[in-house]
């Protein structure tokens, strides 16, 4: 454990809360101290849910540690059952409560509660939130699901969407429509909006659609083995992946593939002259493994970007992400330390970042546009409107989300470029009152340091002079990083310690040859 101001994933019990909050008729009794109730805010404030998570905390305090905290848990469990009357209960301990080793699962088995009580063993100091969600859903399915006769019509289950997931609500709607077009109905969506009764009939479907491997792959593998239900391997994010997904579903279900792409608006732009503006833009990707793998394919094959770096924070997806990075000829960054991510972005100087909420902050600090592609996200990425990531409409949404920071950045660049202009600077007043505006006082020219004598020896550390920094800001943001790198390389190779405006333009002339 370490002290940090940001974490990509919470402890495993937060993953369990995501599953419980997504479901109905399920209640989570969490053995936890008073301070661990912060997790409620994730769902009510950030996801903007209209109800609190179905979680009851024991909320023991320091003074309780001198008495029997086990009795406190038993009383809390009984009270939760009596008050909420759920169809099933899950019980576990938070990271802090794990240290006192009260064994909530063992205690719950001795109480004779007349509904399924599912114990969770979540190693808080070895694993994190996505593992917690995956393990929780697996334990629920393993306890409640049973083999049964298949439905007469071809049906499938959509598995993986949880509370606090990135656009999970809208992805469900989009995939339901895609499958309906092929004559396939949805039997159960789980965990999102499912009840324990729904989980009990999950075995009636012919196959499973694994939407998010991070939160449901263990359950999908178990159902394939125990219930005889194959599951899809393709995540339909992007045009190419959606077409591959349709083909995979058709093969599993034995139906004809069909995709209504009349709503698809991304390919026409890729064929247009305007799209050459995006070709070759250098992008860096970071997030959970599923979304990064999908986004890398879209960036390279559908948008014409150059992927200069990628990585993920969940180590469970490290192997496929590393394999993808090798295909791109780059090295994957597998870390949950946002400072390492910032250092890599700073070193690569991409023209755009595709990441999480943290990368949005990093982009603001470094002056690099950013689009969010993965959880964790903040409130603005839980929109009230329909905004999926999967399927046809998801491809349209991704197209808008990625292109707008680059296109709108041009307007912002022009505003910054003319910020010091005699007519448009901040002190000039409204432009239509130009004749009455006070004449701006001429600023004292900043003294320039004497240029360092050129040295043909080894490279030196270079410093940007103020006037050169101002001139650099006049260069459009999408090539500014490249201009900075080239100028610093040019100065370093020639032993110039301070970069002036002249050095900047000499470097430009040198690399233009």
Swiss-Prot record:
List the residue ranges forming a coiled coil, or say none: none
Positions with a binding annotation for substrate = 409-410
- Which co-factors does it depend on? [4Fe-4S] cluster
Q: How the cofactor binds, per note?
A: Binds 1 [4Fe-4S] cluster per heterodimer. The cluster is bound at the heterodimer interface by residues from both subunits.
* Pfam families, per database record: Oxidored_nitro, PCP_red
Q: What does the UniProt keyword field contain?
A: 4Fe-4S, ATP-binding, Bacteriochlorophyll biosynthesis, Chlorophyll biosynthesis, Iron, Iron-sulfur, Metal-binding, Nucleotide-binding, Oxidoreductase, Photosynthesis
Q: Looking at the record's lineage, which domain of life comes first?
A: Bacteria
Family to which this protein belongs: Belongs to the ChlB/BchB/BchZ family.
Show the HAMAP family listed in the entry.
ChlB_BchB
Please report the name of this protein according to its UniProt entry. Answer: Light-independent protochlorophyllide reductase subunit B
């Amino acid at each position: 454990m370490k002290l940090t101001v940001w974490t990509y994933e919470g402890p495993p019990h937060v993953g369990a809360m995501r599953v419980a909050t997504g479901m109905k008729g399920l209640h989570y009794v969490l053995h936890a101290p008073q301070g661990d109730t912060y997790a409620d805010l994730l769902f009510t404030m950030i996801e903007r849910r209209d109800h609190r998570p179905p979680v009851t905390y024991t909320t023991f305090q320091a003074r309780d540690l001198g008495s029997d905290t086990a009795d406190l848990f038993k009383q809390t469990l009984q009270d939760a059952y009596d008050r909420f009357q759920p169809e099933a209960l899950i019980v576990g301990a938070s990271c802090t409560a794990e240290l006192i080793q009260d064994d909530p699962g063992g205690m719950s088995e001795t109480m004779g509660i007349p509904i399924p009580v599912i114990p969770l063993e979540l190693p808080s100091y070895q694993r994190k939130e996505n593992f917690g969600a995956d393990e929780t859903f697996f334990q629920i399915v393993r306890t409640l699901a049973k083999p049964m006769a298949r439905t007469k019509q071809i049906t499938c289950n959509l598995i993986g969407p949880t509370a606090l997931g990135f656009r999970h609500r809208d992805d469900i709607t989009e995939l339901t429509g895609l499958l309906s077009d092929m004559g396939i109905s949805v039997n159960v969506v789980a965990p999102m909006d499912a009840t324990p009764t729904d989980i009990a009939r999950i075995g009636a479907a012919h196959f499973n659609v694994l939407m998010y491997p991070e939160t449901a792959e263990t359950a999908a593998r178990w159902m394939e083995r125990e219930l005889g239900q194959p599951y899809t391997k393709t995540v339909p994010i992007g045009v190419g992946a959606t077409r591959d997904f349709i083909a995979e579903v058709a093969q599993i279900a034995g139906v004809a593939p069909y995709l209504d792409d009349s709503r698809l608006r991304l390919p026409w732009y890729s064929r247009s002259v305007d799209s050459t503006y995006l070709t070759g833009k250098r992008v860096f990707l970071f997030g959970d493994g599923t979304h990064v793998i999908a986004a890398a394919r879209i960036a390279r094959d559908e948008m014409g970007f150059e992927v200069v770096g990628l990585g993920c924070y969940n180590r469970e997806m490290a192997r496929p992400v590393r394999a993808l990075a090798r295909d791109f000829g780059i090295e994957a960054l597998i870390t949950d330390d946002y400072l390492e991510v910032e250092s890599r972005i700073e070193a690569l100087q991409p023209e755009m970042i595709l990441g999480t909420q943290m990368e949005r902050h990093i982009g603001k600090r470094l002056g690099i546009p950013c689009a969010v592609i993965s959880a964790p996200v903040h409130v603005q990425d839980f929109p009230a409107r329909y905004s999926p990531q999967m399927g046809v409409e998801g491809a349209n949404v991704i197209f808008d989300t990625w292109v707008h920071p680059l296109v709108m950045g041009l307007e912002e660049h022009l505003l910054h470029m003319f910020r010091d202009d005699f007519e448009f600077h901040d002190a000039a007043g409204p432009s239509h009152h130009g004749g009455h505006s006070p004449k701006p006082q001429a600023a004292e020219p900043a003294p320039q340091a004497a240029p360092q004598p050129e040295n043909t020896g080894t490279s030196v550390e270079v410093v940007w002079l103020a006037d050169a920094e101002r001139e650099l800001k006049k260069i459009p943001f999408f090539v500014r990083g490249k201009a900075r790198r080239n100028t610093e390389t040019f100065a370093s190779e020639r032993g110039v310690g301070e970069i002036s405006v002249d050095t900047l333009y000499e470097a430009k002339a040198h690399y233009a040859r």
